[in-house]
């Protein structure tokens, strides 16, 4: 069934006029908004749409100028671009003469006299002051942005030339983003690795890592240089190491054999606690006999050292050495520790090139030395692995 639309006249004349007024004001606001809009890119046609100025009002109509033309509308208002102010005084023109500073100014020269000359000089000094102020404000803004500006720019903007005075050298400014990123990475590295080597500047996450770095890098270099080139080693460098060790209250591994507590008969006094669990025996929870190093005196539980039953019984039959004091049982040296091969039954160390026949690569699985093979025979770890 069709809907019956009531006539506007039946609603009243006041209501009709109010509706027309609302419609007119809405159209006026819409047209004003469209005229003030910036051009936008149409995604379908790729054209930058802008106000077309084709909508005119009755007040814009004019009489026709050509035959058969009823109305004419005014063209779009042309706006002149702003340009530099042209000097009105014809005498205020650029100077075309070379000025000799030593010679006195001639009245017949190209420079004008009186108030015009004063105006030229004042304008020239004023322009220089304005340029200097602009340069100072630019530099201040750039410094402030480098310190406080929050957002990051591309890394490609790291180096940009800054305009300076004509007689000064050109400098380079660092982009805000690159400097900020480098500061962030540096602060993150400082936070993650707070322990710094005072000689080479290398960073570590914990103090044991820094101590290991000192011992195996700088201390070894110093000991080698003391024997070969004693005069080439700076004195303050050795003092830095000694001061660091005193503050740390830590003895390097290379000096532990000399500073270990010794009995009157010359034997090393072992520690009375486990260096791994500090006496708690966390792995088994039961009391265990400590195994002590014959060189440095450090001790450990067999369970903390991950020793097998055969290994625990074998280490008590000879002068056992911890992993840091370990040396080759054949040649007696601790050099080339990367070539040391450890027995899985007695924990003795052997250089692979000291064995007979020598080995080029470590064997796969368990390995037993010739002493354990002779003593344990079929109970050796090497036989168990093969079977």
UniProtKB/Swiss-Prot annotation:
User: Sorted alphabetically, which Pfam families does this protein's record hold?
Assistant: DPF1-3_N (PF14051), PHD (PF00628)
Q: Where is this cross-link: Glycyl lysine isopeptide (Lys-Gly) (interchain with G-Cter in SUMO2)?
A: 106, 129, 133
Q: Which GO terms describe its biological process?
A: chromatin remodeling; nervous system development; positive regulation of cell differentiation; positive regulation of double-strand break repair; regulation of G0 to G1 transition; regulation of G1/S transition of mitotic cell cycle; regulation of mitotic metaphase/anaphase transition; regulation of nucleotide-excision repair
> Which cellular compartments is it found in?
Cytoplasm; Nucleus
Q: Where are the zinc fingers (C2H2-type)?
A: 195-218
Give a GO cellular-component term.
nBAF complex
Zn finger (PHD-type) location: 271-328, 325-375
InterPro entries attached to this UniProt entry: DPF1-3_N (IPR025750), Znf_C2H2_sf (IPR036236), Znf_C2H2_type (IPR013087), Znf_FYVE_PHD (IPR011011), Znf_PHD (IPR001965), Znf_PHD-finger (IPR019787), Znf_RING/FYVE/PHD (IPR013083)
Give the residues the record marks as binding Zn(2+) 1: 274, 277, 301, 304
PANTHER family cross-referenced by the UniProt entry: HL01030P-RELATED, ZINC FINGER PROTEIN NEURO-D4
Name this polypeptide is given: Zinc finger protein neuro-d4
> What species is this protein from?
Mus musculus
What gene is behind this protein? Dpf1
């Amino acid at each position: 069934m069709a809907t019956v639309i009531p006539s506007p006249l039946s609603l009243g004349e006041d209501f009709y006029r109010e509706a027309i007024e609302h419609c007119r004001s809405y159209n006026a606001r819409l047209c004003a908004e469209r005229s003030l809009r910036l051009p936008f890119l149409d995604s379908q046609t790729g054209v930058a749409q802008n106000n077309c100025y084709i909508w005119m009002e009755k007040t814009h109509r004019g009489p026709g100028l050509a035959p058969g033309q009823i109305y004419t509308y005014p063209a779009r208002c042309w706006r002149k671009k702003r340009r530099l102010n042209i000097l009105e005084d014809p005498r205020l023109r650029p100077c075309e003469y070379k000025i000799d500073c030593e010679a006195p100014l001639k009245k017949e020269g190209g420079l004008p006299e009186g108030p015009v000359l004063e105006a030229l000089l004042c304008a020239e000094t004023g322009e220089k002051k304005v340029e200097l102020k602009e340069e100072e404000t630019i530099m201040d803004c750039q410094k402030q942005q480098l310190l406080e500006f929050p957002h990051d720019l591309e890394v490609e903007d790291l180096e940009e030339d800054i305009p300076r005075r004509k007689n000064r050298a050109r400098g380079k400014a660092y982009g805000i983003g690159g400097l900020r990123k480098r500061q962030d990475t540096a602060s993150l590295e400082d936070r993650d690795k707070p322990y710094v080597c005072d000689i080479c500047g290398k960073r570590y996450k914990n103090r044991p890592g820094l101590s290991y770095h000192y011992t195996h890098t700088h201390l070894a270099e110093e000991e080698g240089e003391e024997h070969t080139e004693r005069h080439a080693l700076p004195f303050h460098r050795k003092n830095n190491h000694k001061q660091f060790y005193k503050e740390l209250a830590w003895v390097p591994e290379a000096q532990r054999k000399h500073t270990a507590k010794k009995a009157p008969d010359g034997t090393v006094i072992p520690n009375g606690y486990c260096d791994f669990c500090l006496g708690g025996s966390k792995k088994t929870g039961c009391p265990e006999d400590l195994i002590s190093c014959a060189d440095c005196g450090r001790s450990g539980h067999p369970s903390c050292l991950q020793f097998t039953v055969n290994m625990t019984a074998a280490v008590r039959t000879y002068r056992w050495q911890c992993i840091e004091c370990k040396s080759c049982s054949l040649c007696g040296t601790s050099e080339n520790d990367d070539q040391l091969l450890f027995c899985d039954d007695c924990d003795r160390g052997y250089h692979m090139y000291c064995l007979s026949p020598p080995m080029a690569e470590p064997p796969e699985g368990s390995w037993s030395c010739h002493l354990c093979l002779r003593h344990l025979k079929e109970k050796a770890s090497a036989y168990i692995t093969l079977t």
